[in-house]
């Protein structure tokens, strides 16, 4: 079991790392080419569209993965479920687009940017035909990885080649969603291999309505919880430059979160299968393994990014002087690499397979209220104090994330406490402290002027120090890898 999971984990991590590298190549170029105000406008409009993407999806992918993974070996049963979920998602997409149009034509500031918003909305309109959840349920991680890398590499090359100035905003917006369009075309072409398009009925929608509704509300609350900070900031800062600073500051954190949460695609089908089989031994082992990977990645990332905040944001922004507040925002939000990722894993790997989504919903309701209220309150305070509302919004988001994680640990304590609080976690913390000290010495003691060289040196030396310290401590992941190599 573990070897198969390890392969899937490695494939997903490689995919996410490559996609991250491609983002790092194109994003600084875009920041420098568009400028803070135009980039802030894009981020603000994209955040608005993202709300309706969530309505269009309505939590359907998560439920579809769970249900399709149960019948993955029966082509007709699988085809029936695929057709059912496609119809449900198509209806929700039409509803989402209608609501978005009402919003755009009702709010003056949104109407002024209607062309940009409608270009970005293509992303969720065409996503209806992606069937990505099917390939995840079938555990086609190698196919997903190759396809994603190829399409994003193509789009990144086009962005770097064609986006040159602030007037290229609409061109960039289209190129940013082009990878989704290409992914959909490839998925539809490959779909017939796994399912039939012939009618397989009668359809049974009723059994999905309650779980989809719960997961939809969860997705909506998660969006409010995650994206409202940017949206509120857009109203607090009319120039949108603070939104751009916030976007640059949070970019590297989002990369770490994406790296960890990409593993959901590996763990959800397996966790669902083990729980359905009532195999608590494998279920608990999978939970602990998932948490170990999360901590293994997040702890050293927090340590190194805290020490290299100026260098990281300078590279992400393309060296522009318009992003002066980005480093402090990164430092404030850096713990989200761990807190958000753990919260996501508790939901996806524990609560969702157990069909206890409602507990996550209650926690997110609390988080959304705290984040909205805190962002407005602290954002206005920092706006009046030093005209930096982004810092106030970042503090509110960071505190809310910690509260949400604590609540989820309490809710799922039967499966989470032992998997999270153990000797192995302590070993990872010790390794993280070693990385923190190493990063501090390289960042502030060794005289290196080039930001890229400093980051590469910190990552390389820090990685060696981290792995060696964990090997000496006999940390589970590192020690099991060493033993496997020595066999």
Predicted regions and their residues:
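Helix-loop junctions and terminal segments of transmembrane helices
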Residues: 57-73, 253-291, 344-352
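N-terminal membrane topogenesis motif
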Residues: 1-23, 76, 202-218, 288, ...
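Interfacial segments at transmembrane-helix termini and the short loops linking adjacent helices
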Residues: 104-120, 240, 305-338, 342, ...
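Membrane-interface junctions at transmembrane-helix termini in multi-pass inner-membrane proteins
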Residues: 125-148, 335-366, 414
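Membrane-proximal transmembrane or re-entrant/amphipathic helices at the cytosolic face
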Residues: 238, 419-424, 439-487
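Membrane-interface helix-loop junctions in multi-pass transport and translocation proteins
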Residues: 31-39, 109-111, 138-142, 146-184, ...
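Signature of the first transmembrane helix
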Residues: 3-62, 97, 101, 152, ...
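Interhelical loop/hinge segments that connect adjacent transmembrane helices in multipass membrane
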Residues: 1-2, 145, 169-176, 185-227, ...
């Amino acid at each position: 079991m573990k070897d198969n999971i390890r392969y899937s984990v490695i494939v997903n991590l490689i995919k996410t790392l490559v996609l991250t590298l491609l983002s790092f190549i194109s994003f600084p170029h875009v920041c420098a080419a568009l400028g803070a105000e135009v980039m802030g406008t894009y981020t603000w409009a994209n955040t608005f569209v993202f709300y309706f993407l969530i309505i269009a999806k309505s939590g359907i992918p998560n439920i579809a993965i769970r249900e399709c993974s149960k019948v993955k070996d029966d082509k007709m049963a699988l085809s029936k479920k695929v057709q059912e979920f496609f119809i449900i998602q198509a209806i929700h997409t039409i509803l989402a687009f209608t609501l978005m149009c009402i919003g755009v034509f009702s709010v003056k500031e949104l109407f002024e940017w209607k062309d940009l918003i409608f270009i970005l909305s293509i992303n969720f309109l065409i996503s209806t035909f992606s069937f990505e959840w099917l390939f995840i349920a079938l555990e086609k991680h190698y196919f997903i990885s190759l396809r994603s890398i190829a399409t994003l590499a193509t789009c990144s090359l086009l962005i770097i080649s064609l986006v040159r100035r602030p007037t290229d905003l609409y061109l960039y917006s289209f190129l940013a969603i082009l990878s989704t369009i290409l992914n959909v075309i490839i998925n539809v072409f490959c779909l017939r291999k796994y399912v039939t398009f012939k009618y397989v009925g009668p359809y049974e929608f009723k059994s999905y309505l309650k779980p989809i509704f719960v997961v939809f509300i969860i997705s909506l609350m998660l969006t409010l919880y995650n994206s409202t900070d940017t949206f509120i900031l857009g109203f607090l800062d009319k120039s949108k430059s603070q939104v751009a600073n916030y976007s640059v500051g949070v970019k590297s954190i989002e990369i770490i979160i994406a790296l960890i949460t990409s593993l959901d695609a590996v763990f959800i089908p397996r966790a669902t299968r083990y729980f359905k089989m009532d195999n608590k031994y494998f279920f608990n082992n999978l939970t602990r393994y998932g948490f170990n990977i999360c901590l293994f990645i997040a702890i050293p990332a927090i340590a190194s990014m805290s020490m290299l905040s100026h260098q990281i944001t300078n590279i992400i922004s393309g060296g522009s002087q318009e992003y002066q507040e980005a480093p402090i925002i990164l430092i404030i939000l850096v713990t989200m690499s761990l807190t958000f990722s753990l919260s996501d894993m508790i939901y996806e790997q524990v609560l969702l397979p157990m069909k206890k989504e409602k507990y996550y919903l209650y926690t997110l309701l609390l988080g959304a209220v705290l984040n909205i209220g805190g962002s407005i309150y602290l954002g206005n305070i920092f706006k009046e104090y030093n005209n930096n509302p982004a810092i106030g919004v970042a503090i509110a988001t960071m505190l809310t994330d910690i509260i949400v994680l604590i609540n989820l640990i309490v809710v799922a304590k039967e499966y989470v406490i032992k998997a999270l609080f153990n000797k192995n976690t302590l070993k990872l913390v010790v390794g993280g402290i070693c990385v923190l000290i190493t990063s501090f010495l390289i960042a502030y003691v060794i005289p290196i002027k080039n930001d890229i060289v400093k980051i590469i040196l910190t990552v390389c030396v820090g990685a060696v120090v981290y792995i060696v310290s964990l090997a000496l401590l006999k940390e589970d992941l590192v020690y099991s890898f060493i033993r496997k190599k020595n066999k």
